[in-house]
């Protein structure tokens, strides 16, 4: 696995020429075929097998027969072909494949400086979209492509909607101001800059291409995942099964796992991702910390409440309390970062879908997924659920097991999300107090337990009977943790 130089630019290229069914080795076809193949090969070798120094990508640098034979041999060796120095059919087959355009030659396996990001949380922004796909599809493709890398290393990607991000993503046409113009359909597909200031990490896609989430056209997830590898500091791999192999090959976005070679390469830069498979650390008694919230105060409330396995979790500021459902003993506070480092503090909402073994934690316009206490990839955007853009945060969430609906509370309204269909129900949002008789005030947290929904609003917890459609009792919120 190679690592991209700090000044490196990677471009994904697809040749538009068709295969010649009658072309034997050494151009023994028509003179036109021979000339076309020769010029195509010369351009390819100059682009990918010349150490260009300060030259722009794609610039013609070296000429001459002996130099070309040497480059052909380099190409053949890189792709595991029989090394002859001749432009035989197999070699031309490789030359005509769709591929990424970062050169295949380098002075070192790890380039001088080993360019990489110096922080673990990176921002990204999609500033321009393509008409080939809906914005939601583009958002999803980019998120999944970044998640492919964060699953292997301790990097998190947070999407922002304004300002300058570490990784600026856009769909461009022609000359777009970075000295690497696009050339229309079936030419250069995309390019990405290595980690660094300014253009570092930025990833551009040719808007003239037909982008899809399927096998037709060019699969955006496949190209984006490859280019983000460059944006994180990787060059090409000689392993044909690797995502960072130079030639384009469709990858199914769903169920994709980063190949071993790519894992090895990215972990050489950033180290392996630490997983949290066990139980969180619980101190042997309340921490002696003056900033610990006084949860037993008469006015105290919770930010979020959720089931997690057979336990209940209660969140407040940077602390959470953990208790067995039917036991009130052994309840102790712990910092959120001790078990959920990426959440830090101030969780807005949380809920569990027990049938999937997954829990969802919300903070601002983002959410995280866990299996038990193990984080599953980077943060995602709440707009995946179908929220309108004016919704910036979720106040509370509760999953109803019988109906497989999840209710999201925002202000004095709530939304209903169908977990089976993975989309919002129609005719929402609705007014919370009108739909849930007896529940007053803004909902801070909610959880379903033993057929009841418990709504937490300030210091009160309303026990709501879903069959009677009414509140049957009102408790103190902090009574749930022994106050």
Swiss-Prot record:
GO biological process: amelogenesis; collagen catabolic process; extracellular matrix disassembly; extracellular matrix organization; protein catabolic process; proteolysis
One of the Pfam families matching this protein, by short name: PG_binding_1
Residue positions binding Ca(2+) 2: 183-184, 186, 188, 206, 209
Segment forming the signal sequence: 1-22
Gene Ontology cellular component annotations, sorted alphabetically: extracellular matrix; extracellular region
InterPro entries: Hemopexin-like_dom (IPR000585), Hemopexin-like_dom_sf (IPR036375), Hemopexin-like_repeat (IPR018487), M10A_MMP (IPR033739), MetalloPept_cat_dom_sf (IPR024079), Pept_M10_metallopeptidase (IPR001818), Pept_M10A (IPR021190), Pept_M10A_Zn_BS (IPR021158)
Chain positions of Hemopexin repeats: 293-343, 344-389, 391-439, 440-483
EC number(s) reported in the record: 3.4.24.-
Record function comment: Degrades amelogenin, the major protein component of the enamel matrix and two of the macromolecules characterizing the cartilage extracellular matrix: aggrecan and the cartilage oligomeric matrix protein (COMP). May play a central role in tooth enamel formation.
Residues binding Zn(2+) 2: 176, 178, 191, 204
Annotated domain remarks: The conserved cysteine present in the cysteine-switch motif binds the catalytic zinc ion, thus inhibiting the enzyme. The dissociation of the cysteine from the zinc ion upon the activation-peptide release activates the enzyme.
Family in the record: Belongs to the peptidase M10A family.
Highest taxon above the source species: Eukaryota
Primary localization class, coarse: secreted
Keywords per UniProt: Autocatalytic cleavage, Calcium, Disulfide bond, Extracellular matrix, Hydrolase, Metal-binding, Metalloprotease, Protease, Repeat, Secreted, Signal, Zinc, Zymogen
GO molecular function, one term: zinc ion binding
Organs and tissues of expression: Expressed specifically in the enamel organ.
Protein name per Swiss-Prot or TrEMBL: Matrix metalloproteinase-20
UniProt propeptide residues: 23-107
Residues the record lists as binding Ca(2+) 1: 164-166, 197-198, 200, 202
Classification via SUPFAM superfamilies: Hemopexin-like domain, Metalloproteases ('zincins'), catalytic domain, PGBD-like
Active site location: 227
Localisation: Secreted, Extracellular space, Extracellular matrix
Organism: Sus scrofa
Location of the motif Cysteine switch: 98-105
Top enzyme class: hydrolase
């Amino acid at each position: 696995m190679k690592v991209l130089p700090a000044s490196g630019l990677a471009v994904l290229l697809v040749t538009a020429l068709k295969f010649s069914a009658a072309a034997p080795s050494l151009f023994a076809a028509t003179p036109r075929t021979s000339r076309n193949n020769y010029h195509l090969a010369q351009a390819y070798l100059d682009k990918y097998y010349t150490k260009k120094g300060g030259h722009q990508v794609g610039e013609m640098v070296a000429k001459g027969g002996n130099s070309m034979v040497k480059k052909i041999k380099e190409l053949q060796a890189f792709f595991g072909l029989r090394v002859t120095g001749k432009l035989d059919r197999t070699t031309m087959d490789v030359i005509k494949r769709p591929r990424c355009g970062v050169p295949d030659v380098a002075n070192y396996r790890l380039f001088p400086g080993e360019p990489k990001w110096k922080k673990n949380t990176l921002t990204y922004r999609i500033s321009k979209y393509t008409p080939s796909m809906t914005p939601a599809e583009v958002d999803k493709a980019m998120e999944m492509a970044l998640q492919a890398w964060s699953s292997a290393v301790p990097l998190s990607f947070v999407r922002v909607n304004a300002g300058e991000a570490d990784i600026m993503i856009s769909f461009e046409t022609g000359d777009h101001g970075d000295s690497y113009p696009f050339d229309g359909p079936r030419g250069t597909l995309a390019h990405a800059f290595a980690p660094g200031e300014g253009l570092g990490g930025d990833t551009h896609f040719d808007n003239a291409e037909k982008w899809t989430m399927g096998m037709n056209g060019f699969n955006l997830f496949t190209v984006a995942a490859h280019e983000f590898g460059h944006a994180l500091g990787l060059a090409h791999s000689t392993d044909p099964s690797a995502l960072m192999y130079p030639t384009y090959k469709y990858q199914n976005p769903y169920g994709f796992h980063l190949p071993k070679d790519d894992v090895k390469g990215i972990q050489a830069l950033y180290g392996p991702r630490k997983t949290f498979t066990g139980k969180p650390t619980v101190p042997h008694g309340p921490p002696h910390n003056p900033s610990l919230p006084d949860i037993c105060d008469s006015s105290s409330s919770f930010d979020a409440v959720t089931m997690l396995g057979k336990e209940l979790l209660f969140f407040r500021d940077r602390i959470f309390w953990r208790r067995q459902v039917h036991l009130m003993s052994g309840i102790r506070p712990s910092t959120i970062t001790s078990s959920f480092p990426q959440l830090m503090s101030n969780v807005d909402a949380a809920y569990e879908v027990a049938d999937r073994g997954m829990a969802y934690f919300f903070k601002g316009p983002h959410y995280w997924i866990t299996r038990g206490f193990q984080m599953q990839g980077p943060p995602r955007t709440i707009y995946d659920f179908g929220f309108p853009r004016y919704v910036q945060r979720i106040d509370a969430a509760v999953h109803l097991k019988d109906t497989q609906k999840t209710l999201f509370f925002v202000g004095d309204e709530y939304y209903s999300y169908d977990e089976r269909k993975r989309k919002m129900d129609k005719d929402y949002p609705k007014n919370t107090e009108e739909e849930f008789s007896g529940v007053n005030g803004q909902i801070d947290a909610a959880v379903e337990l033993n057929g009841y929904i418990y709504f937490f609003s300030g210091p009160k917890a309303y026990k709501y009977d879903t069959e009677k459609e009414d509140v049957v009792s009102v408790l103190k919120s902090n009574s749930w943790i022994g106050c």
